[in-house]
Amino acid sequence: MLNLLIKLTLSVAILFYNFSVNAACMKEGDKVVLSGVMKEELFYGPPNWGEERQHDEKLFYWILHLNSPLKCVNDANTERDGWDSNVQLIVSSEDYKTKRNLLNHHITVDGNVMLAVTGYHMTSVLLKDISFKPIE
């Protein structure tokens, strides 16, 4: 009986531990605030996604190089290099025009977490519906 009680107690403890770990993780749709250096970076698109750079479409995206790496994002592709330190920003056409002066500077943005789905998503984690915060 004591053995059964110990096993039950251990099972409950492990279950609560797993819930607490996942509760601390970001998930798609979460509103977050991130800081880092924003850079415009070149990526290659169709038709060969960098295999034949002279023929591939050139894609320029704004990438936030985070001050502190992400710890946990549910369902993110954590096998991709830099998954936890670089976030692609989904920027409005108006912000592309008016916020270029912030490139290569330390910034703070808030927005909603989005996970990479297509070949046009260059980082595992993206940030959409963003707004730029005043630099303090």
How would you name each of these model-derived features?
Residues G29-F60, N67, G111:
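Structural detector for short beta-strands of small beta-barrel domains
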Residues D56-G82:
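Mature extracytoplasmic domains of secretory-pathway proteins
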Residues N74-T98:
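Beta-strand/loop nucleic-acid-binding surfaces
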Residues L66, V117-E136:
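OB-fold/S1-family single-stranded nucleic acid-binding modules
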Residues L2-S11:
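Sec-dependent signal peptide recognition
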Residues N18-S20:
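N-terminal signal peptide c-region/cleavage motif recognized by signal peptidases
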Residues E94-V109:
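Short nucleic-acid-contacting surface segments enriched for D/E, G, S/T with interspersed K/R
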Residues N22-D30:
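Cleaved targeting-peptide boundary
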